[in-house]
């Protein structure tokens, strides 16, 4: 279904001729894909109604017991694919720390970087190793 939402011509065609429902887990407006779909509906005069849901990120912040307004930007630690290893996640964590803010760190689910294999959750030890590599890379720049 992801392809149909990211390239929504068929979905929009159905919506032009009758009611269509798209059910997603969590808050749909936290995904740029769903924001794009909403924008297309507005542009084409297609009526829509969004019912926000509870997101895993909001739940994680709530369950942490920390004050939600003390969180900075959330960060995703991506798997390293080939030579690809961005240092921006580490920099965002540092920026949040320097501003006295907590960081909600999400761990990647796609070891291929292309969505061609079954999702595999990154484990915390992998995330730590990747952060260490990011640190070494950023020191070398």
Which residues does each PLM region occupy?
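Active-site/ligand-binding-proximal alpha/beta "capping" segment
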Residues: 27-30, 34-43
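Glycine-rich beta-strand-to-loop/alpha-helix junction loops that act as flexible
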Residues: 24-27, 52
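A short acidic, glycine/proline-enriched capping/turn motif at secondary-structure boundaries
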Residues: 4-5, 27-30, 56-57
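Beta-strand/loop-alpha-helix module characteristic of Rossmann-like adenine-cofactor folds
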Residues: 10-12, 16-21, 32, 39, ...
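Glycine-rich, highly charged phosphate/nucleotide-binding loops
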Residues: 1-11
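Short beta->alpha connector loops at strand-helix junctions that form conserved
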Residues: 1, 52-53
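Short, flexible loop segments at the rims of nucleotide/cofactor-binding pockets, characterized by
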Residues: 1-3, 26-27, 80-83
